[in-house]
Amino acid sequence: MAVGKVKQIVGPTLDIEFPPGQLPNILNAIKIIDPKDQRELIAEVAMHLGDNQVRCIALSSTDGLVREAQAVDTEAPISIPVGSPTLGRLLNVLGQPIDEMGAIENAEISPIHKASPTFEEQDTQGVIFETGIKVIDLLCPYTKGGKVGLFGGAGVGKSVIVMELIHNIATHHGGYSVFCGIGERTREGNDLWLEMKESGILSKTSLVFGQMNEPPGARMRVGLTGLTMAEHFRDQEHQNVLLFIDNIFRFVQAGSEVSALLGRMPSAVGYQPTLASEIGSLQERITSTKHGSITSVQAIYVPADDYTDPAPASIFPHLDAATTLSRQIAELGIYPAVDPLNSSSRILDPHVLGEEHYQVARQVQKVLQRYKDLQDIIAILGIDELSEEDQLTVSRARRIQKFLSQPFFVAETFTGKKGRFVKLPDTIKGFKMIVEGEMDNIPEQAFYMVGTIEEVFEKAEQMK
């Protein structure tokens, strides 16, 4: 193993000199021993500078590190523990436990940098993945083994939907989940950990965190750490895995910080020039193979609610379904605040979902679109000036809008309402009854924050 010396430290970047002819490869992990307190720091080779020097990105804080510290080339990429021993555990980017529950024993070790599966190995079948959330299952259904984006600005409920999906998958599908927290609030990570413990779903989940307080190197690589764990469950244990990433935008942001530290010329809006290829290298590995599937749900922060920003715009093409959260809908008090007209799915197709589901979904969207078109007229002239047909459309649209809300299990403590998992046939039946006019005489308020259409009747009875 080649041994070098640290020559320069600038924030999270390190320049290390190695003996001639012993330069480490790019992406190799370098172990640096701090001579003062003997602590170990891992850095990753990012570029060769010439003169036998490499520039590395540190994956933990460089505070207190001194020049001339010894650096050892591990001759391999960052490698982490994978498999069953990681279930129920909380790890950092290097696969080290940060839950104070002792070391991870008897786990296989796997490098985080790998090639994506070849086209021959991939499996592309369109099967709906039932989430139990009405608005998602009806209007932007998720594909088993697909990639889903949760788009939304700050504070519209992305993380809550992610937590609800983890809950529903663990209780109704029984599969393994990997949760990857990239550059989000440490408090949210702690809340998630405690909630999972309480609800008893921790034993089916591995958690990997590289939060806001971590250096950019850790935030940039923690996505690959989580993905490597999910790939092991798929390929070696033949499981159907769920990979949750919160937030994929922070992965891009960390890449942008690293790019600036390495002195690369920024591209549009100050992002890194390698934006598309960085996202591609992560997304291409999230796929279904003949062994099993990885279904990924990625929360995507949209800077200043601008969907044309290069970061969300370069993530869009990789997705099978996009669930867009809207501030206007959140302001109406409708949660989950999913925008039914801007959310889309590749499998919203009669050949995949069946004719009934497709027709009901399209009718719901048609009614809501007409209601949206009439908003200006209603605001200026009032609802009484509309034709009878349009008045009926508006009253149905309002019922649909309220019925798209749903109490969540993970939000029980805030709402005081018991969570609901609504099966797909019940969802279709409920919305079909509304668009066909069977519910026109039921008061609007009865549709708010309920599960199935049967609950609407019960609530209407109580309101009398």
From Swiss-Prot:
CDD domains named among the record's database cross-references: ATP-synt_F1_beta_C (cd18110), ATP-synt_F1_beta_N (cd18115), F1-ATPase_beta_CD (cd01133)
Catalytic activity, reaction form: ATP + H2O + 4 H(+)(in) = ADP + phosphate + 5 H(+)(out)
InterPro entries in the record: AAA+_ATPase, ATP-synt_VA_C, ATP_synth_F1_bsu, ATPase_a/bsu_AS, ATPase_alpha/beta_chains, ATPase_F1/V1/A1_a/bsu_N, ATPase_F1/V1/A1_a/bsu_N_sf, ATPase_F1/V1/A1_a/bsu_nucl-bd
Keyword S-adenosyl-L-methionine annotated: no
EC number(s) given by UniProt: 7.1.2.2
One Gene Ontology CC term in the entry: plasma membrane
Chief place where the protein resides: membrane
Subcellular location(s) per record: Cell membrane
Residue positions binding ATP: 152-159
Pfam families hit by this protein: ATP-synt_ab, ATP-synt_ab_N, ATP-synt_VA_C
Record's keyword terms, sorted: ATP synthesis, ATP-binding, Cell membrane, CF(1), Hydrogen ion transport, Ion transport, Membrane, Nucleotide-binding, Translocase, Transport
Domain of life: Bacteria
HAMAP family xrefs: ATP_synth_beta_bact
Sequence similarity: Belongs to the ATPase alpha/beta chains family.
Protein's name in the database: ATP synthase subunit beta
Organism: Protochlamydia amoebophila (strain UWE25)
Gene: atpD
